[in-house]
A protein has these predicted regions:
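Flexible phosphate-sensing "switch/lid" loops adjacent to ATP/NTP-binding sites
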Residues: 1-224
Length: 224
């Protein structure tokens, strides 16, 4: 959209430091480490963070229209719902029209969409305006019956089917994607070995090498 990135677009960043805690970066500045117990526990430090997120949204709202809010993970995690500040709670605070994006490439899209919507609270469900089917391989017209079935099951229309694209490079959201990265040395290429550490941040800096045919970046546990 031609707008320079700003910390208001990602006011709360968590960078894992070990299996039980993360560094908290607030409005672009580190403010300390927080354990999962502190983050999700009785003290619920997320309340203060949520206030900061609201203020960041208000600053963006004053400058731009429309604003796209991207959720994180499932919107129907029952055990986390009362403490989740990234999905429906933020949507309610912003009065945002909400669209559920479902990855059909993983399989089980009908159960996933139906179950997710069925578990929403009434005040959350009223915000739902449509379902978007992502990563569809083949002829999208073959999913017409699927669109009708999902509308019948959920009462919410499928507003779009996005095909699988092989020629676009979008940064991965988190390190879970590293499991699918290339891990093979190739002859005739400039090989770049990237050591798979337990916790990696900024690994998307290597994406540019993947787009250059001269290079073969590969991820490995071998430090020899």
């Amino acid at each position: 959209c031609g707008i320079s990135p700003h910390t208001d677009m990602n006011p709360i960043l968590l960078k894992p430091t070990n299996d039980k805690s993360s560094q908290v970066v607030l409005n672009g500045k580190p403010v300390g480490n927080m354990s999962a117990k502190d983050y999700f526990g009785i003290q619920n430090q997320k309340e203060e963070l949520f206030k900061e997120a609201i203020e960041a949204f208000k600053r963006l709202e004053a400058r731009y229209n429309p604003i796209v809010l991207e959720g994180a993970g499932s919107i129907s995690e029952l055990n986390l719902r009362d403490r989740d500040i990234t999905n429906m709670r933020m949507a309610i605070a912003a009065g945002a029209s909400t669209y559920l994006v479902a990855d059909i490439d993983r399989g089980g899209v009908f159960g996933s969409v139906y179950g997710t919507i069925a578990l929403l609270r009434p005040e959350e469900r009223v915000l739902m305006k449509g379902v978007i089917i992502n990563k569809f391989r083949g002829d999208a017209s073959l999913f017409e019956e699927g669109r009708s079935l999902l509308k019948e099951l959920t009462g919410i229309p499928v507003v779009g089917v996005i095909p699988w694209f092989r020629d676009i490079k979008i940064e991965e959201e988190d390190s879970v994607a590293l499991d699918m990265k290339n891990n093979t040395y190739k002859d005739g290429k400039i090989n770049v070995a990237i050591i798979l550490l337990k916790r990696m941040s900024n690994f998307t800096d290597f994406d540019v090498l993947e787009m250059d045919p001269r290079f073969n970046p590969y991820y490995t546990n071998n430090i020899d």
